[in-house]
């Protein structure tokens, strides 16, 4: 049976089966350490009965006033464990913690505009395309992103998910 728990320091040496995948964004060690120290409740792993890491969620809280929200920095599942509902479980954990612990209005995430599989998955989880962010992903292959959102209990009127009527540039993003 799969269990979820907070990410621990030693997991940094155990999650290569998840991280070394072309679909997974990877970060440097200080990035992961920052999340562990600032938002430990939003940095979780799914663990198999044999103690191998099946996937993880890297999240944080940010914003102010009605823009106070949970943010999905990364959610990824090892290829061997995909299509078992683990991403949904990890997302629900982050949503519940964002709502119950951080009292957030919504959860958001950014996804490559070309990643139709992920976009479809997030839409099945109740996320909507809030706005297109032009040139969000820089580098050798620059690409737009979708800022996708899901309203939480605190946003009774669902104001946080009313789609914008125009694309924005990264410098226009506000929290």
Walk through the language-model features, giving the residues of each:
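Short acidic/glycine-enriched loop/turn segments that link adjacent beta-strands
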Residues: 39, 66, 115, 139-143
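Conserved GNAT acetyl-CoA-binding A-motif
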Residues: 98-110, 121
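Conserved G/P- and acidic residue-centered "switch" motifs that form tight phosphate/ATP-binding loops
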Residues: 85
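Acetyl-CoA-dependent GNAT
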Residues: 2, 9-82, 91-102, 151-155, ...
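Conserved catalytic-core motifs of GNAT/GCN5-like acyltransferases
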Residues: 108-110, 123-147, 173
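Short glycine/proline-centered loop/turn elements that form peptide/ligand docking sites
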Residues: 91, 115-118, 135-140
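Loop/turn elements at beta-strand to alpha-helix junctions within RNA-recognition modules
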Residues: 78, 112-115
């Amino acid at each position: 049976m799969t269990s979820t728990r907070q990410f621990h320091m030693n997991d940094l040496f155990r999650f290569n089966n998840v991280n070394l995948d072309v679909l997974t964004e990877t970060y440097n060690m200080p990035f992961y350490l920052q999340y562990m120290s600032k938002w430990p409740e939003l940095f979780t792993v799914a663990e198999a009965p044999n103690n191998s890491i099946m996937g993880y969620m890297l999240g944080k809280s940010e914003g102010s006033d009605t823009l106070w929200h949970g943010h999905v920095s990364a959610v990824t599942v090892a290829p061997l464990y995909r299509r078992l509902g683990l991403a949904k479980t990890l997302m629900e954990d982050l949503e519940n913690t964002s709502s119950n612990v951080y009292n957030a209005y919504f959860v958001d995430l950014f996804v490559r505009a070309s990643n139709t599989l992920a976009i479809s998955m997030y839409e099945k989880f109740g996320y909507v395309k809030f706005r297109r962010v032009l040139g969000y992903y820089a580098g050798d292959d620059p690409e737009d992103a979708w800022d996708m959102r899901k309203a939480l209990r605190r946003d009774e009127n669902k104001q946080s998910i009313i789609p914008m009527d125009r694309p924005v540039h990264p410098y226009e993003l506000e929290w």
